């Protein structure tokens, strides 16, 4: 471990887990909370709320660490990522790996306070999180794999509340898989030129000139599946208002990404968590007023 002042070391750890960019974990928190509310048929209680908020943030942070370790040689050639702690040499791989392990263990301890079914589902969640960065070497749509990894929180939420994973959970999982495909393709559009040079595979490269149309299609599938699976739950106008606000944001995203500028695509990605927030607000308010 290099001789770096403790305050500076903490700053590097926070940079490693993207603590200064909450959009990255908010895109995961909102769908997970919406699933938790549906699974519990309303407010799930403070214990589960705390477990899933903290667990989601911890696992996303661990995922960032794993991603940076796996991509450290590629990140040197990407304009946006050259100064990340591992890539720039400010943190060693072993030290970063230790950070990731600690974060994962803390998240696992939190899950242990729930049902064993939730604990069981947390194992593949960790495995997919570890494997995701390596799919960018050979899989044409690694964002789809990311969607699988990101949305285990939905499955685990139902397992923690109900001790099972019903069809509703899987439809919500699929809906949010499309949401991840949408916003992470926006993110991939930011780095497309650099990724082409270094041979990285992304959905933005695979989709080519159909990228914007595909993103809009992914958003529509997300909202459509969410509306379809939640309509029977009697959540009334709050659900439809939330979905309407989310749809309005999708329209705004189109204006941001249609010209494919780095700035517009990054803005779209960084604001994408508001779509999940609108849906969660509709679900939570619907249960409150039901």
From Swiss-Prot:
CDD domains in alphabetical order: PT_UbiA_COQ2 (cd13959)
UniProt key word Nucleus: no
GO CC aspect terms: plasma membrane
UniProt GO molecular function: 4-hydroxybenzoate polyprenyltransferase activity
Keywords linked to the UniProt accession: Cell inner membrane, Cell membrane, Magnesium, Membrane, Transferase, Transmembrane, Transmembrane helix, Ubiquinone biosynthesis
UniProt cofactor(s): Mg(2+)
Entry membrane topology: Multi-pass membrane protein
InterPro entries linked to this entry: HB_polyprenyltransferase-like (IPR006370), Prenyltransferase (IPR039653), UbiA_prenyltransferase (IPR000537), UbiA_prenylTrfase_CS (IPR030470), UbiA_sf (IPR044878)
Pathway: Cofactor biosynthesis; ubiquinone biosynthesis
One record GO biological process: ubiquinone biosynthetic process
Ranges that cross the membrane: 33-53, 91-111, 116-136, 138-158, 165-185, 212-232, 237-257, 269-289
PROSITE patterns (alphabetical): UBIA
EC number(s) from the headed UniProt entry: 2.5.1.39
Cell compartments where the protein resides: Cell inner membrane
Gene3D superfamilies the record matches: UbiA prenyltransferase
Reaction(s) this enzyme catalyzes, per UniProt: all-trans-octaprenyl diphosphate + 4-hydroxybenzoate = 4-hydroxy-3-(all-trans-octaprenyl)benzoate + diphosphate
PANTHER family hit by this protein: 4-HYDROXYBENZOATE POLYPRENYLTRANSFERASE, MITOCHONDRIAL, PRENYLTRANSFERASES
Record function comment: Catalyzes the prenylation of para-hydroxybenzoate (PHB) with an all-trans polyprenyl group. Mediates the second step in the final reaction sequence of ubiquinone-8 (UQ-8) biosynthesis, which is the condensation of the polyisoprenoid side chain with PHB, generating the first membrane-bound Q intermediate 3-octaprenyl-4-hydroxybenzoate.
Family the entry assigns: Belongs to the UbiA prenyltransferase family.
Classification via HAMAP family: UbiA (MF_01635)
Official protein name in the record: 4-hydroxybenzoate octaprenyltransferase
Native source species: Acidovorax ebreus (strain TPSY)
